[in-house]
Amino acid sequence: MGEQLDPFSASNLPDFISSQKIGRPVNFEGQTNRGHPFSGLKKRGQSSRSWVKIDQDGNSAVLELDKATIMKRCSLPSRDLRLLDPLFIYPSSILGRERAIVVSLEKIRCIITAEEVILMNARDASVVQYQSELCKRLQSNHNLNVKDDLPFEFKALELVLELSCLSLDAQVNELEMEVYPVLDELATNISTLNLEHVRRLKGRLLTLTQKVQKVCDEIEHLMDDDDDMAEMYLTEKKERAEAHASEELEDNIGEDFESSGIVSKSAPVSPVGSTSGNFGKLQRAFSSIVGSHKSLLSSSSIGENIDQLEMLLEAYFVVVDNTLSKLSSLKEYIDDTEDLINIKLGNVQNQLIQFQLLLTAATFVAAIFAAVTAVFGMNLQDSVFQNPTTFQYVLLITGIGCGFLYFGFVLYFKHKKVFPL
């Protein structure tokens, strides 16, 4: 008999099976499945949204970007993007990150980088006003070739602060125009309708005070921390990164040039090689000197720009603090009106108590008079009751006595200062 062959040996398997690697599935077309069958589908929560991009020249464009693209483009964590979602209500905040500034003030929510501003494509009037005003300012500076001391990110941040402060101040002025007439009317006419109106206005005042106080605290927090202000200077960090990259590139080119001049075996040793090596050393020394000089200039410019940012924040801090002072004055006026109303209500209550006291004294005197007259209404056998004129004298004397008694009560109350003199 011939040699039996193992039907399960690798040599007897078909070519298309033996050529596949173990552990990799095979499809019916002879191709391996290298990915998830639904790799083309987007992950949940990665839907695209409309964003408005404004560059340094004032040109705006609408972009369709998803959350992951924004995070990668601006180097932001996902929690910072939640501040930009108009569906959620978050307190006002200004966050400085490595490559961007996340701003959420009032209804203006945007991402500011060293080159562009990205904001939600909302139809809110504040966002539309911010977009048009920023584009107009940037385009005017670009057309007139005006060089401003403030970098791009500070210009965008300044406009956000300006519009937010104007919006808050307008809300405060509107509330003042509505509150003062109502309080004056309430001081003269205390009614349930006026009290309910003042209660609603006081709720609006409390909400607006919290919003203004949050903006004021956020600006003050930035002013108190120099590191946060330095972190917000994106243009300087970008220039330093580019300078550092160019220095590394020069160093690498110098090292390659030096190694090619020294290690070359095909060319004979000549003064040219030594010259190239000396040139590489000189180039590296020059680049190190230039790098140290640039770092010194960058550090000094950071200090100057921190001062610029601090002055910018301080200016708007004064504006917000003035708005907060208006709200405090308005709250004090409401408290004074409430105190006046309580005084008036207390006065009315005292008058009611005085009237009740007089009525009680009159009731006591009338009860005495009624008790005396009731005696003559009894069926008693006495000579006094037989004389008709006696009853008239008794009534007269009792009435005069009750009058003197009531007058004595009034004098006693005045003596004890229960009644005003």
Curated annotation (Swiss-Prot):
Location(s), subcellular: Membrane
Motif annotated as Required for magnesium transport activity, chain positions: 377-379
Gene3D superfamilies associated with the record: 2.40.128.330, Magnesium transport protein CorA, transmembrane region
Position of the signal peptide: none
Pfam families for this protein: MRS2-like
Gene Ontology CC: one annotated term: membrane
Transmembrane domains' residue ranges: 357-377, 393-413
Topology of this chain in the membrane: Multi-pass membrane protein
Tissues expressing this chain: Expressed in the whole plant.
MF GO annotations: magnesium ion transmembrane transporter activity
CDD domains assigned to the protein according to its UniProt record, in alphabetical order: Mrs2_Mfm1p-like (cd12823)
The entry's keywords: Ion transport, Magnesium, Membrane, Transmembrane, Transmembrane helix, Transport
Family statement drawn from the similarity comment of this UniProt entry: Belongs to the CorA metal ion transporter (MIT) (TC 1.A.35.5) family.
Function text: Magnesium transporter that may mediate the influx of magnesium.
Other remarks on this protein: Has the ability to complement a mutant in yeast lacking magnesium transport capability.
Name of protein: Magnesium transporter MRS2-5
Organism the protein comes from: Arabidopsis thaliana
Gene name of this polypeptide: MRS2-5
